[in-house]
């Protein structure tokens, strides 16, 4: 405790907020600890325990900051254990913090987390402002970063946190960044002579890092403009950039404004001919450049590389530069680049490519030690980015009339459900006084209606309330499904149906109606770095490159329900056919391969049905007597226990995913039957957990890593999740990577053959296509063969000795595609006859 500050600041009788009212003794109004006049003052959210202070000290020592010369204080001054500090508490404590800073006169302040950022510089958004330098009213310099608690919750943030501390150390000690990390030799291309000089320079360059600034997110908007373009170059044998060129384009102060699109086109060939072409999240830049006539492609993407090397870490350019290079954040505060001074825009743009180039060189050195990851990037991730650039620009066709019709039906279904629900609602005089209106969404009314009026049991509650009252009864869909199963009631049926139709109406059809363009297409964004497991995601929204605001682009195809009512609005336009090619039971097949589970491998090698086989085991019946429902239950067993699910969870999963009612006793018996039938899976599970504990990571057969620092977590639930991921990540990532590689191969094959057929995206383990009718006979067998024969052995030395099967379905619509017999796909005569019957023949 700093006695000088304590005597001047501490008010042991403070009752200014609920924290102070509960805190007692030394836990009330805790003031700064450390030297009277510290060079560096650290400000956190709450007073630290001894353990927390020692953990922070260890971080400081790691970057050569002496904890004994550093002071620490908190935004909220009282230490309590069951009350959450909010804005009111922060406001009540702010005079104490201000007085501490006034007395201690630190030269530097390190603000840990959002609360400290707000209290010291009045801003919000720690991920946006971390690593930047601000002026405090006292004259001190403030540098914000994340709190150590965020590192505990997400170990992937550790490297960035330590890098921020090292940056503060360097700033506060007067050290400067390395000479090669200084942005210099920048040329603003504002004349024809300089444009010619840039073109000549590109002819001799070995590599470029490029980046654009835009006036928005959607390149198809009528007013879409590229504000500026930056290109950083290097020559052969260089390990650092040599020059940066910034080209003002559509900015109001740009000399090229009247002809900026022509400048973009002029740079197409010079940029495309440079051997090495790098960008960060380059799919965005390539999409925009293609919209305006520049088809430059990537040979490397630093965001894709960052994800491949460590999927847990932040993948934004700024945190990567801070972590890998030790530089501070650079940013532009404007919300509209078109209204910001041109000089500021160009400087920001130049920093982007300058540091992209530096990050690229760091990654190249790291990849030299991990050639298997380099091959994954070269064979899959980077060419997939190229393929998805075109896929995103093309979009997926939507039957506008069907969409509008189904949107109307959804609203009518909701009204019908609400009308019936109202018949169960009692007269208003029976309602509690604090409830004023009917609300069938999760609300005070619906909870009273279900759990008090109808007296249905409460299965789960939310967090305990600050006053000690029980949390609200949960109306989560999973809990409602359990109620439906165990305590049937018409109201529960109606509420679950209401949830479905409400989701259809608002999350799907209303969103689609807003997003569909004049060509009846919806454009989405596919994210190759969207999940830590390696699976793709789509439509989650991209951050605007300037403001950081997240905007939705298209639909999340992974979440479109299998219900034909929704999927049926997607398809192919007249003269074309929608093709879906889906890997059959690919996770079971891959798991059998990884576990060397001979029973499973033999079933697949001999073409037997693994679900029927499991049903036979569960029922002691011959295959001929296994019913459809018994096979369905066996399917739930196979997929449910594949990754080691417990019996209790299986009861809920079987019901929610398959509509199968299973008792806990049955689930235990089914689990035993599963591992008795496939014993090597159990051994493989144990092996994966052991590998994760030993190496803190696991790998797929082709070397994609899943880093699992949480495997050592003291929290059982966190540790259990890491163990679960040690089992399912290698399987799911391998299956997803195989689909992406197949898409890359097919994308190139279609181009080489001059075909119009193209992919419209992936959904988990399936690839969807749009094909002209006259190309079906050629592309259907091509798609199936390519997906089943990805050259894993040639590229990665992996001999996949389990048959991989891709099922092909075709139709006018996604939801109504008809599956083709596998033998027919490979028989030209039968395929031609079938196409003719479907009126697909030309």
Task: Indicate where each model-derived feature is located.
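A common structural junction motif
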Residues: 785-796
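Acidic, low-complexity intrinsically disordered tails
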Residues: 1-6, 175-197, 238, 812-842
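Metal-dependent phosphoesterase core characteristic of DEDDh/y 3'-5' exonuclease domains
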Residues: 54-57, 61-63, 121-131, 138-142, ...
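A polyanion-binding, active-site-adjacent surface
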Residues: 1-175
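Short hydrophobic beta-strand that contains or immediately precedes a catalytic carboxylate
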Residues: 42-44, 145, 208-210, 279, ...
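Acidic beta-strand-to-loop metal/phosphate-binding motif
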Residues: 105-113, 209, 275-282, 578-580
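Conserved "right-hand" nucleotidyltransferase catalytic core of DNA-directed polymerases
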Residues: 170-251, 273, 294-297, 312, ...
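Conserved catalytic core of nucleic-acid polymerases
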Residues: 386, 390-393, 457, 485-488, ...
């Amino acid at each position: 405790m700093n006695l000088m500050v304590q005597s001047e600041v501490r008010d042991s009788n403070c009752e200014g907020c609920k924290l102070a009212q509960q805190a007692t003794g030394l836990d009330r109004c805790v003031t700064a600890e450390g030297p009277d006049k510290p060079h560096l003052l650290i400000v956190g959210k709450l007073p630290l325990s001894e353990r927390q202070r020692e953990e922070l000290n260890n971080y400081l020592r790691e970057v050569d900051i002496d904890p004994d010369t550093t002071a620490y204080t908190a935004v909220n001054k009282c230490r309590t254990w069951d009350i959450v500090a909010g804005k009111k508490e922060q406001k009540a404590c702010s005079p104490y913090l201000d007085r501490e800073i006034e007395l201690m006169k630190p030269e530097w302040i390190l603000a840990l987390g959002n609360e400290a950022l707000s209290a010291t510089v009045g801003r919000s958004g720690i991920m946006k402002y971390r690593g930047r330098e601000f002026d405090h009213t006292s004259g001190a310099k403030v540098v914000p970063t994340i709190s150590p608690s965020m590192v505990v919750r997400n170990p992937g943030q550790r490297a960035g946190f330590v890098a921020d501390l090292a940056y503060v150390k360097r700033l506060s000690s007067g050290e400067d960044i390395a000479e090669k990390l200084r942005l210099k030799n920048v040329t603003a291309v504002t004349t024809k002579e300089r444009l010619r000089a840039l073109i000549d320079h590109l002819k001799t360059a070995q590599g470029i890092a490029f980046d654009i600034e835009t006036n928005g997110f959607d390149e198809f908007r009528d007013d879409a403009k590229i504000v500026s373009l930056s290109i950083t170059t290097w020559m052969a044998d260089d390990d650092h950039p040599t020059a940066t060129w910034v080209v003002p384009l559509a900015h109001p102060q740009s000399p090229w404004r009247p002809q900026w699109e022509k400048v973009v086109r002029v740079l197409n060939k010079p940029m495309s001919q440079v051997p090495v072409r790098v960008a960060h999240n380059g799919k965005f830049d390539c999409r925009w450049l293609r919209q305006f006539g520049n088809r430059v492609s990537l040979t490397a993407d630093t965001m894709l590389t960052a994800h491949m090397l460590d999927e847990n870490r932040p993948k934004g350019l700024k945190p990567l530069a801070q972590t890998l290079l030790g530089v501070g954040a650079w940013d532009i505060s404007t919300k509209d680049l078109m209204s910001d001074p041109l000089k500021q825009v160009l400087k920001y743009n130049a920093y982007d490519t300058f540091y992209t180039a530096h990050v690229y060189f760091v990654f190249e050195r790291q990849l030299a030690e991990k050639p298997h990851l380099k091959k994954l990037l070269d064979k899959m991730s980077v060419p997939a980015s190229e393929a998805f650039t075109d896929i995103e620009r093309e979009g997926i066709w939507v039957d506008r009339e069907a969409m509008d019709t189904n949107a109307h039906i959804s609203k009518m279904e909701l009204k019908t459900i609400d009308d019936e629900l109202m018949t169960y609602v009692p007269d208003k005089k029976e309602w509690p006084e604090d409830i004023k209106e009917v609300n069938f969404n999760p609300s005070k009314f619906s909870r009273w209606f279900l759990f008090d009026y109808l007296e249905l049991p409460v299965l789960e509650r939310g967090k305990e309330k600050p006053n000690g009252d029980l949390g609200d009864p949960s109306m989560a869909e999973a809990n409602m499904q359990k109620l439906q199963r165990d305590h049937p009631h018409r109201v529960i049926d109606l509420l679950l149906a209401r949830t479905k139709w409400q989701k259809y109406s608002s999350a799907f059809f209303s969103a689609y109606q807003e997003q569909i363009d004049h060509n009846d297409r919806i454009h989405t964004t596919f994210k190759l770095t969207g999940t830590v497991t390696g699976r793709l995601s789509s439509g989650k929204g991209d951050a605007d490159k300037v403001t950081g605001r997240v905007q939705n682009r298209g639909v999340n195809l992974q979440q479109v329900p299998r219900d034909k009512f929704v999927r049926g609005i997607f398809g192919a336009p007249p003269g074309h056919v929608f093709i879906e090619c889906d890997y059959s039971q690919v996770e079971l097949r891959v798991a059998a391969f990884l576990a060397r589970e001979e029973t499973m491998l033999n079933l697949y090698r001999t073409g037997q049905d693994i679900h029927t086989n499991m049903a036979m085991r569960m029922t002691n019946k011959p295959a001929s007597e296994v019913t459809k429902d018994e096979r369905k239950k066996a399917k739930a067993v196979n997929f449910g226990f594949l990754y080691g699910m417990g019996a209790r969870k299986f009861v809920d999963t079987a019901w929610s995913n398959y509509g199968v009612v299973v008792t806990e006793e049955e689930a235990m018996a089914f689990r035993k039957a599963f591992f008795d039938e496939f014993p090597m899976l159990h051994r493989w599970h144990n092996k994966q957990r052991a590998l994760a504990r030993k190496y803190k990571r696991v790998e797929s057969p082709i070397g994609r890593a899943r880093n699992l620092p949480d495997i050592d977590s003291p929290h059982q639930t966190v540790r259990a999740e890491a163990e679960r991921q040690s089992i399912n990540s290698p399987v799911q990532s391998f299956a997803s990577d195989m689909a992406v590689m197949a898409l890359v191969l097919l994308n190139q094959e279609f181009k080489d053959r001059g075909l119009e057929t193209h992919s419209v995206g992936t959904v988990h383990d399936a690839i969807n296509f749009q094909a002209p009718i006259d190309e079906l006979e050629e592309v259907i067998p091509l798609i199936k063969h390519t997906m089943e024969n990805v050259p894993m052995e040639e590229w990665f030395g992996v001999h996949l000795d389990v048959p991989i099967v891709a099922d092909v379905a075709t139709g006018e619509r996604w939801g109504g595609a008809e599956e083709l017999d596998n033998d027919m796909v490979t028989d030209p005569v039968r395929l031609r006859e079938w196409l003719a019957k479907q009126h697909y023949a030309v």
